[in-house]
């Protein structure tokens, strides 16, 4: 069996797969759609993250493809319906990076509320700290609205509460008891 890795993934993934099949990693990560189409013909397993899009053209070029392993949560970059029609199984990794995404969300909230990016730029360009130019606001006591309260949204809410924020959330797909 042949496996093609088309994005930066943990070396442990390639090492583990290498025990069972011939593993190749694209020279350019991620490859362009045309490069992928040219190199996917005899591949059985495709390991990727989000680029390039796996559409009908790519799937038709993949004559032997049996499995697409996605090292992320979302599958909106793959024509999953057509993959299923062709007998290609598509797997993702729910929860893989949820905590990292939630932490980054809180980080961006802090950057915006504390003006850290423009303050850093001012210090590096002007070589001085103007403590009055970048007065920020605390997160404590603020209300955070979360649209979509799946794993990541719930984790953002947990972290925000630690900062003393009130969290309100909406998700049409979850039962009411999730929000209490």
What annotation goes with each model-predicted range?
Residues 2, 66, 89, 142-145, ...:
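Structural signature of beta-strand start/N-cap positions in the alpha/beta core
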Residues 16, 104, 108, 155, ...:
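Rossmann-fold NAD(P)-dependent oxidoreductase module
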Residues 1-43, 164:
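N-terminal glycine-/charge-rich "phosphate-binding" loop or analogous flexible N-terminal tail
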Residues 132-180:
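Rossmann-like dinucleotide/phosphate-binding beta-alpha-beta segment
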Residues 2, 12, 22-24, 98, ...:
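Structural/interface elements that position substrates and couple domains in central-metabolism enzymes
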Residues 25-31, 49-50, 123-132, 178-180:
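Short gly/ser/thr-rich secondary-structure transition/capping motifs
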Residues 44-124, 136-140:
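Phosphate/diphosphate ligand-binding glycine-rich loop within oxidoreductases
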Residues 41, 54-59, 172-180:
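Rossmann-like adenosine-cofactor binding region
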């Amino acid at each position: 069996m042949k496996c093609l890795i088309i994005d930066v993934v943990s070396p442990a993934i390639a090492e583990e797969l290498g025990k069972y099949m011939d593993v190749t990693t694209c020279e350019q990560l991620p490859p362009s759609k045309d490069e992928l189409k040219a190199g996917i013909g005899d591949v059985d397993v495709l390991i990727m993250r989000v680029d390039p899009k796996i559409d009908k053209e790519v799937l038709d070029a993949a004559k032997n493809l049996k499995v697409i392993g996605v090292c992320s949560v979302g599958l909106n970059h793959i024509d999953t319906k057509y993959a299923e029609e062709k007998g290609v199984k598509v797997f993702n990794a729910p929860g893989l990076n949820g905590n990292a995404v939630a932490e980054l969300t809180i980080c961006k909230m802090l950057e915006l509320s504390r003006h850290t990016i423009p303050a850093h730029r001012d210090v590096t360009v002007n070589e001085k700290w103007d403590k009055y130019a970048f007065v920020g606001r605390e997160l404590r006591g603020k209300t955070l609205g979360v649209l979509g309260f799946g794993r990541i949204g719930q984790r953002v809410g947990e972290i925000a509460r630690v900062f003393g924020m009130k969290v309100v959330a909406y998700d049409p797909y979850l039962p009411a008891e999730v929000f209490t």
